[in-house]
């Protein structure tokens, strides 16, 4: 199973991520997003950052997760290569919205500060959006699709 693939959207760029678990989808979407920004094979694991996000739906959590990673890139220049989920809570096993449930994810992101002399600049991603957003389970595979503003 492939981990992610870019989606060609007129005027924007999208990403489709896959996983055997919802955690894997979050990891693969983040790595896929980083690969749209630069060649992640050139990223070294020189430092790590901790990310924690909590929202009231799986869709909100997914978009907020990616936007938090974009924030760390835009603000601090940090670009990730490897992600370890430290904890996650997705309410019940259903991916339907339940306003009383909490959806959380905490992870350690390993990477380094972006260096334009060593790292290729591909796309400047401004934000993950809700446009055509999908997070779902199809048979035994979790999938997520997201469109980015560039």
Where are these regions (language model features)?
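Intrinsically disordered, low-complexity regions
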Residues: 1-150
